[in-house]
């Protein structure tokens, strides 16, 4: 499709997590978090590499102990994606992973210790050019805020976040991003809206503890979709009680749906009815699995009959319109060929791969011309 999302991004400052730019108009980064034991180096490395393969820009790793910090050192040496260390309570762990090359520290200054310990962590981060993420969560609000507000509210999450921001401001440290997560969609959305008006730093979006693969994806799509459509958000994580790989896939699907950032194929497919001339559902499911390695952005419409098929094909990179025994194949809105319905999956996979190669080559040539 050629339509552009009419979304004006919120202006924010720029930080870098490793080599990934965050904020100030940079592409919205998609991240996940490992759910292995960090001390199990092999399992953690394997999971991070699986996340890399599906396009993760950043991966967060929990580092709850010094043993985990030593494991983090080995993990960092074996992966390419930037790593965020998730640390609570023990400032010494933050200092240790900073020594081992961490790309970002996820901490709350308020639970890392007294002012001197906070200063030590911030000074270390400044010296090593390591950004910090302040992570506020409705499930772990400070006791006095729970008593003040009675329950998690947008104002409570905002007040908690601003306390931590003030900690860093007093230390003249501005290389940070902030999140204010909640499992309730409306609580999270309103909290982010309030925070976006208060600070200029990048915001990391998430609906925390969203649920299983299906319900969590729905909650995240609604909550993150609302914020992203308003231009709020610089990084995101879809939190699912599922394989972390699914978090990355859903994250990119949300961005693709809003036309904010595209990676891989955007399949447009009908829900099918008795008019379908070939197995649309089986075709789409098979192609989604077979073509996971394709990162070239393109729209592929797979429609089972001639009612909506031609119209969708006109605005797709490639489109199939169901027909009797053979279906029409469109490329860039022009009908090019007919595909045998009994061999649809193999034929369409070959055409999509060929088109992806063609688009990649065209982009490579464009880049070379710009660089000359």
From Swiss-Prot:
- Give the EC number(s) listed in the UniProt record: 1.17.7.3
**Pfam families found in the cross-reference section:** GcpE
Q: Which GO terms describe its molecular function?
A: 4 iron, 4 sulfur cluster binding; 4-hydroxy-3-methylbut-2-en-1-yl diphosphate synthase activity (ferredoxin); 4-hydroxy-3-methylbut-2-enyl-diphosphate synthase activity (flavodoxin); iron ion binding
Q: Which reaction does it catalyse?
A: (2E)-4-hydroxy-3-methylbut-2-enyl diphosphate + oxidized [flavodoxin] + H2O + 2 H(+) = 2-C-methyl-D-erythritol 2,4-cyclic diphosphate + reduced [flavodoxin]
Q: Which residues form a coiled coil?
A: none
A biological process (GO) of this protein is: terpenoid biosynthetic process
Cysteine-cysteine disulfides: none
Keywords in alphabetical order, please.
4Fe-4S, Iron, Iron-sulfur, Isoprene biosynthesis, Metal-binding, Oxidoreductase
Q: Binding of [4Fe-4S] cluster: at which residues? A: 270, 273, 305, 312
Give the InterPro entries listed for this entry.
Answer: Dihydropteroate_synth-like_sf, IspG_bac, IspG_bac-typ, NO2/SO3_Rdtase_4Fe4S_sf
Q: What does this protein do?
A: Converts 2C-methyl-D-erythritol 2,4-cyclodiphosphate (ME-2,4cPP) into 1-hydroxy-2-methyl-2-(E)-butenyl 4-diphosphate.
Q: What is this protein called?
A: 4-hydroxy-3-methylbut-2-en-1-yl diphosphate synthase (flavodoxin)
Task: Tell me what organism the protein belongs to.
Answer: Shigella dysenteriae serotype 1 (strain Sd197)
The root-end lineage is:
Bacteria, Pseudomonadati, Pseudomonadota, Gammaproteobacteria, Enterobacterales
Gene encoding it?
ispG
């Amino acid at each position: 499709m050629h339509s552009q999302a009419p979304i004006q991004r919120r202006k924010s400052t720029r930080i870098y997590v490793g080599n990934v730019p965050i904020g100030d108009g940079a592409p919205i980064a998609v991240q996940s978090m490992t759910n292995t034991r960090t001390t199990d180096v092999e399992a953690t490395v394997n999971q991070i590499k699986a996340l890399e393969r599906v396009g993760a820009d950043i991966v967060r790793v929990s580092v709850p102990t010094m043993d985990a910090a030593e494991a983090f050192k080995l993990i960092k040496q074996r992966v390419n994606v930037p790593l965020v260390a998730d640390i609570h309570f023990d400032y010494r762990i933050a200092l240790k992973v900073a020594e081992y090359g961490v790309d970002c520290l996820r901490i709350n200054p308020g639970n890392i210790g007294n002012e001197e310990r906070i200063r030590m962590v911030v000074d270390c981060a400044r010296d090593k050019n390591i950004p910090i993420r302040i992570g506020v969560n409705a499930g772990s609000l400070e006791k006095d805020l729970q008593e003040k507000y009675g329950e998690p509210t947008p104002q409570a999450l905002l007040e908690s976040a601003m306390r931590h921001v003030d900690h860093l401001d007093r230390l003249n440290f501005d290389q940070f991003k902030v999140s204010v997560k909640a499992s309730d969609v409306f609580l999270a959305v309103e909290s982010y809206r309030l925070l976006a008006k208060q600070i200029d730093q990048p915001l990391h979006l998430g609906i925390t503890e969203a649920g299983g693969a299906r319900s969590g994806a729905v909650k995240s799509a609604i909550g993150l979709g609302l914020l992203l459509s308003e231009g709020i958000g610089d990084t995101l994580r879809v939190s699912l009680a599922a394989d972390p790989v699914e978090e990355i896939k859903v994250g990119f699907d949300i961005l693709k749906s809003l036309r904010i950032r595209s990676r891989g194929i955007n399949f447009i497919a009908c829900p099918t009815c008795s008019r379908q001339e070939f197995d649309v559902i089986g075709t789409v499911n098979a192609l989604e699995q077979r073509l996971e390695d394709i990162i070239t952005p393109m729209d592929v419409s797979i429609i089972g009959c001639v009612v909506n098929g031609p119209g969708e094909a006109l605005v797709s990179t490639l489109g199939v319109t169901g027909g009797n025994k053979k279906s029409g194949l469109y490329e860039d809105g022009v009908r090019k060929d007919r595909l045998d319905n009994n061999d649809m999956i193999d034929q369409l996979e070959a055409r999509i791969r060929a088109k992806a190669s063609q688009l990649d080559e065209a982009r490579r040539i464009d880049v070379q011309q710009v660089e000359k």
